[in-house]
Amino acid sequence: MSSGGLLLLLGLLTLWEGLTPVSSKDRPNFCHLPHDPGPCKGNFQAFYYHPVRRTCLEFIYGGCQGNPNNFKTIDECKRTCAA
């Protein structure tokens, strides 16, 4: 392979790495837990990370227990799990 071809390949690999989303290995483990409203009967807007869709979604949190995949704002969810 010519040096020009190697440089092109190296450039493409570098670009691909930069455009690839964050690996699931880089996310906290709790980002992969399903949303859990908990047993209480509150009605609080919350957000959780959906690993298949690779985005944060809204759900209604009951106000107690649940799991750590539970954020008060979508920005907090994105910073923690989708960044």
UniProtKB/Swiss-Prot annotation:
It is found in: Secreted. It comes from the Eukaryota. This is Kunitz-type serine protease inhibitor mulgin-5. Residues 31-81 form the BPTI/Kunitz inhibitor domain. Serine protease inhibitor. Expressed by the venom gland. GO terms for cellular component: extracellular space. One of its GO terms (molecular function) is serine-type endopeptidase inhibitor activity. Belongs to the venom Kunitz-type family. CDD domains: Kunitz_textilinin-like. The record marks 41-42 as: Reactive bond for trypsin.
